[in-house]
Amino acid sequence: FTAWQRGTAFRAGANNDDSCTASRWVLLSDGNDIVDVVRSAGDVDSSFYSIGLDVETVDKKFGIVQIIENINTGALGGKGNTPVSLSFKAKVSGGGKLDNVKAAVIAWSGTADSVTSDVVSAWNAEGTAPTLATNWTYENTAANLSVTTSFADYKIENISVDTSSTNNVAVFIWSDVTDTDAGDFLYITDVQLEPGATANDFKRETHTTTLSQ
């Protein structure tokens, strides 16, 4: 989360559901003004920044998604043949209620790059994964990652992207909690999706390289 070209905070209108925020990440939420998005400190040993999701409207699910362009999906290997692995760092703070964070790789089988960026059709009850919009499919079964108040590495490995006619792939990370307090925070950084059955250390790029992409 080194590139914040659109600003370093997204609040009051700029934080609505399906709003583009930092580094091409799209904010998703069960309604508008559910969380503010702010540039926050990353992990002390590596990450300069993280994305901070600050609860404004309580008892609603929220998350972020990044959609990979069709031309770049080839870097993930042969669709249906090469597994992919997702890794990232996360932590929470606040009243201790953000205790169910999940992540998934999802696939788009509609027209290449003509994606529905609001990938959630229905957020559903706590503990039940959101229903995805038409043409989006979960490629792994999302489980509670038990995120704590300290940054830690989370890995979901050996994911088979086997949806027929996959044209785009996305990473979706969300809070699956419907009992939150105002001021609860979810911090996420160092998100990496790569080909292979295991996740490797995060590959750091210069700020200039990130901005050029």
Language model features: what each stretch is:
Residues 2-213:
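Extracellular and organelle-lumenal recognition/adhesion modules and their flexible linkers in secreted
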